[in-house]
């Protein structure tokens, strides 16, 4: 096994163990921003994961959600970590939340691990080697007709700048898609695209740690990931659309129809 993947799995699995240790405890829940929660489980899980990464790779850079580092990449090796993606779900005992660990090298994704805690599903990818779910190769779906497409999205609770055109888009998609879901954890949504459960995904107000791992998993599963302008510059832009090639193209077309261009541009 690729050494970086081996350590990423070790760190992510240790993070899952830390999360599970909090399930029988009373959580300390705080707001770090408008409608943006953090729990003591997030902090402890991040500490667990970063401890392993720093021990194994002391010279690597780290970008992690709860350390609030500036969202940038160096030309070297950077680990991008979300200790609990879906903190609000976790805080309310809604059983969809993930640990996400990614390695980017020279500003490109190289290794990705996402573990959905309650289902114990391990999604992994190494650049150029495909994507797997619990060790089995996965691929995006082959759906091409919108009326047969099953799509995921999100409704950012701390950014209402797009809510009006976003809901108009949502209403239109309700009429032409087979179904839309909002599980509340972008990493899980994206991984479900990678394994063919969902055919596409779109959302805004996402950060690098929300998409760094799962987007590589989608690409290695044969899918497409772009920003809302159809460009490859999506890691820090806070706008993402993904899917198999056909459904990605359809969602991108609808985004262009319903969201003004200035609101589709990356957020710097």
List where the protein language model places each region.
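Acidic beta-strand-loop-alpha-helix segment within the catalytic core
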Residues: 102-190, 237-268
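Generic detector of well-ordered alpha-helical packing
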Residues: 43, 47, 66, 83-86, ...
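Oxyanion/phosphate-interacting regions
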Residues: 1-10, 168-175, 188-268
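Residue-level detector of anion-binding/catalytic polar loops
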Residues: 59-61, 137, 179, 199, ...
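Residue-level signal for inorganic ion chemistry
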Residues: 19, 42, 53, 87, ...
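Glycine-rich active-site/cofactor-binding loop and its immediate structural neighborhood
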Residues: 77-119
């Amino acid at each position: 096994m690729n050494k970086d993947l081996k350590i990423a799995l070790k760190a992510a699995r240790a993070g899952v163990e830390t999360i599970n240790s909090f399930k029988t405890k009373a959580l300390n829940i705080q707001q770090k921003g408008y409608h943006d929660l953090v729990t003591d489980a997030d902090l402890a899980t991040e500490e667990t994961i970063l401890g392993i990464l720093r021990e194994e790779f002391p010279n690597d850079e780290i970008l992690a959600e709860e350390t609030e580092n500036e969202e940038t990449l160096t030309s070297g090796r950077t680990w991008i970590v979300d200790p609990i993606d879906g903190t609000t779900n976790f805080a309310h005992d809604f059983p969809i939340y993930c640990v996400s660990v990614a390695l980017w090298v020279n500003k490109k994704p190289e290794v990705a691990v996402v573990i959905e805690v309650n289902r114990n599903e391990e999604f992994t990818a190494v650049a150029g080697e495909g994507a797997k779910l619990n060790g089995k190769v996965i691929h995006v779906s082959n759906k091409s007709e919108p009326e047969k497409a099953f799509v995921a999205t999100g409704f950012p609770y701390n950014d209402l700048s797009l809510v009006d055109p976003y809901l108009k888009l949502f209403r239109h998609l309700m009429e032409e898609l087979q179904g839309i879901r909002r599980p509340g954890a972008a990493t899980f949504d994206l991984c479900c695209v990678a394994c063919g459960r969902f055919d596409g995904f779109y959302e805004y107000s996402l950060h690098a740690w929300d998409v760094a791992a799962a987007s590589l998993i989608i690409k290695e599963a044969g899918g497409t990931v772009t920003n809302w302008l159809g460009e490859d510059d999506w890691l820090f832009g806070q706008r993402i659309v993904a899917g198999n090639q056909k459904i990605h193209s359809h969602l991108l077309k609808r985004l262009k129809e319903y969201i003004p261009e200035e609101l589709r541009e990356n957020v710097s």
